[in-house]
């Protein structure tokens, strides 16, 4: 790995130099183990601890196939799908790997007793397989996480509709929380030149997801002047939705859970903010019954912030806890666009408020290549900024995942892989200087209370 890192850090390395590098037989990777999928049996979701299930293992470098690339990973980040993988909820990801392994002789590589996780990366191309023409060894890249086969016609208008669509590092193996990653070449995009490795790795999954969900015609199709209710507006996903709303001329109504998260939203430029804890919203009376009076109180508060208007779009991702309220507060003809369901997948709402008011529920999942490319282009132009708040080493990935699981983080949590320290990889100092305050906004925010314990990673 030292040879690879030296080449990346050298100012003089050429594509030929990278092509001449020998690929190691093995690399370090963050994994979960197939024989441990029942380790949290009987525990509540909250009590399942990623620090116990995530391992840092030495694993063999996978075979490189047609249309693929091996990438030296300088940095990655933690998403909720890595948390779900680590706690084996809502199911073990080894079922995904088994099914993928049955697709072809080549995909058998993915069906292993360990799963290398992670759906973000920033790094450098080391090798490309047959049929790859757009990317070459030495290219500095980021990767989006959509893996598709595109052998069916279904995916050719929108690749997210490909029957063999999968999320890399979640439903496939050889993900980005590692020193080397295996990706399809059509996952690659240019690394934003003004960002460090860890900053460039942070937007990836959540930035592309927010773009499709809120901006794209495949999602809510936000337009200028729209009132957009954003749950978790300072979090990993919501922070990008807030930025897209502001950049696109919409009016974000940011829902947060603390004063410091409200302050982050203000610093991003938002004016309408609801601290749901401070204002005491409790949308459920008990485990089985929601409280419509709280929906009405919430809707009244929104109208106070918008000059009497209801919201055109609700950016939904908490799921069960908030979905009834989301449907209620949306204006007639408005859109609830939903993904993830981090508080529970079984949504309940009063259908009278949907059907009689002609509202729409739109499901949104990640992004196609074009949407991911456009989202990354906005980052590269300095229009949208990373929301990186904290960076861990590869050895500390378990703690990073724990912090995300317990909501002890702001924005995105980064992980250094091959990068020996933070701040490396910046190529455009002038653009960086123009946007340095926005780039560091989440880094400067005070950390939530956290508790560190020993673990495997």
Regions found by a protein language model. Give the residues of each.
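NAD(P)H dinucleotide-binding glycine-rich loop of Rossmann-like/cofactor-binding domains
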Residues: 107-113, 119, 146-232
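Helix-to-beta-strand junctions that scaffold the AdoMet/dcAdoMet cofactor pocket
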Residues: 223, 330-331
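Rossmann-fold NAD(P)-binding glycine/threonine-rich loop
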Residues: 341-356
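Adenosine-nucleotide cofactor-binding segment
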Residues: 230, 246-321
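A short N-terminal beta-strand-loop micro-motif at the entrance of redox/enzyme domains
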Residues: 4-22, 37-75, 114-116, 131-132
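Hydrophobic/small residue at the entry helix of a nucleotide-binding pocket
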Residues: 209, 236-237, 321-322
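C-terminal hydrophobic helical "lid"/dimerization subdomain
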Residues: 2-22, 324-327, 369-457
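Glycine-rich beta-strand-centered segment in the early N-terminal region that forms part
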Residues: 60-77, 91-152
């Amino acid at each position: 790995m030292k040879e690879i890192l030296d080449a990346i850090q050298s100012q003089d390395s050429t594509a030929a130099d990278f092509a001449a590098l020998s690929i190691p037989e093995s690399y370090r990777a963050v994994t979960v183990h197939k024989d441990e999928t029942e380790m949290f049996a009987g525990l509540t979701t909250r009590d399942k601890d990623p620090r116990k299930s995530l391992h840092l293992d030495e694993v063999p470098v996978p075979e490189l196939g047609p249309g693929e690339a091996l990438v030296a990973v300088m940095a990655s980040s933690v998403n909720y799908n890595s948390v779900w993988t680590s706690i084996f909820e809502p199911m073990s990801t080894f079922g995904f790997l088994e099914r993928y392994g049955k697709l072809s002789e080549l995909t058998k590589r993915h069906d292993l007793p360990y799963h290398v996780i992670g759906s973000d990366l920033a790094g450098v191309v080391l090798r490309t397989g047959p049929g790859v023409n757009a990317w070459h060894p030495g290219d500095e890249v980021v990767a989006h996480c959509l893996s598709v086969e595109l052998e069916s016609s279904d995916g050719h208008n929108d690749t997210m509709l490909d029957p063999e669509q999968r999320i890399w590092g979640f439903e496939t193996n050889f993900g980005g929380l590692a020193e080397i990653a295996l990706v399809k070449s059509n996952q690659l995009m240019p690394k934003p030149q003004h960002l460090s490795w860890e900053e460039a790795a942070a937007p990836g999954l959540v930035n592309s997801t927010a773009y499709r969900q809120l901006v794209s015609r495949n999602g809510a199709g936000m337009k200028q002047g729209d009132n957009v209710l954003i749950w978790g507006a300072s979090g990993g996903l919501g922070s990008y939705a807030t930025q897209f709303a502001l950049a696109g001329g919409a009016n974000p109504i940011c829902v947060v859970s603390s004063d410091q998260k409200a302050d982050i939203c203000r610093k991003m430029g938002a004016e309408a903010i609801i601290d749901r804890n401070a204002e005491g919203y409790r949308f459920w009376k008990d485990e089985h019954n929601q409280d419509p009076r709280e929906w009405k109180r919430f809707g009244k508060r929104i109208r106070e912030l918008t000059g009497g208007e209801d919201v055109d779009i609700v950016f939904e991702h908490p799921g069960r806890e908030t979905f009834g309220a989301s449907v209620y507060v949306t204006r007639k003809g408005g859109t609830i666009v939903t993904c993830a369901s981090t508080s529970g997948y079984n949504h309940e709402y009063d259908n009278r408020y949907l059907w009689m008011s002609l509202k729409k529920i739109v499901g949104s999942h990640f992004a196609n290549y074009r949407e991911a490319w456009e989202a990354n282009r906005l980052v590269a132009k300095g229009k949208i900024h990373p929301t990186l708040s904290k960076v861990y080493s590869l050895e500390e990935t378990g703690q990073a995942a724990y912090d995300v699981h317990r909501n002890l983080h702001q924005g995105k949590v980064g992980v250094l892989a091959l990068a020996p320290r933070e701040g490396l990889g910046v190529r455009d100092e002038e653009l960086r200087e123009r946007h340095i305050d926005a780039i560091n906004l989440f880094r400067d925010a005070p950390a939530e209370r956290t508790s560190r314990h020993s673990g495997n990673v």
